Amino acid sequence: MNILMTSVSRKVALVNAFKQALAEEVGGQVIAIDASPRSAALYFADKAYIVPSGLDQDFLEAVKGICQKDDVQLLIPTRDEELPFFAAIHESFKRIGVTIMVPEPGVVKTCQDKRKFIYFCIKHGFRVPITYEKPEDVVQFPVFIKERMGKGSKWTFRVENASELDDLLARLKDPIIQEYIQAPEYTIDLFADFSGQVLSVVPRERLYIFGGESFIGRTSKKWEIIQEAMQLAQALRLVGHNTIQCFWHEEQVKFIEVNPRYGGAANLSFASGAFTPRMLVRLVLGKKVEPCIGQFKDRYYMLRYTEDLFISEQEMKQIERFHQDRAL
């Protein structure tokens, strides 16, 4: 079985996790693609290609061509911008024998549009931070402001007063204003099969965050979070591996966002016992995967650090460039 991972960038841990999953379960190759030969994770995959940048026809033909050339059975998008692109075409890939780990287009849209996600949560009875429809509705500072379609920590701000708020509202395209919550923040790695049955849930507390990613984290068997995350996943119709963020505030779960893809620190959940890459491989092979809710090491820590990779320019040039004409 061969797996294609897109936009691998520096996601070395994720590439290695799927190599391990294949080795344990069935054998095969992890094939990595990116638009830049300077992407570290390319050099850890079994095979790598440079593909056209942008989500256009050239990119699509290159991806489809690689899938056909290398007999790919599973495709894993890893970048937010790719999710609506692959959600829209996943049925056509099924016809060539490729399963894409992505939910339906409407689910992706609800997750990526932060205002839609807030309304969805309210409609279905899930708590979210207090959201102000208009700046004059703000009753207390500080508040938190973010872009409606923002990604990660980009364009997110803590705002201390009305003057700062007015300044940011003038600069941002489509801002959302919420209460500022000072409370433990959790990322939940939730995995569901392709029918939406939740198989694994691991909350991990974000103890130190840099650039929107958790660099020090700790797993937590907080059952209130586990149960609410399962209910949210079923309401949204999530499939595959998902990254859910929430606060534990005033003895309540308050959801922030859902990213229907692998997150940067998912390897903490893998190490604690919820090895979802192997679960995903088994599902694609048509094997039964039993739910393992709560079966992970509690209070297990991740301390992330930077590791350097040194390669020559010649090695960089050896990565094959896969262009549209090769895919036809």
What are these model-predicted stretches?
Residues 128, 199, 239-241:
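Short, structured loop/turn "capping" segments at alpha-beta junctions
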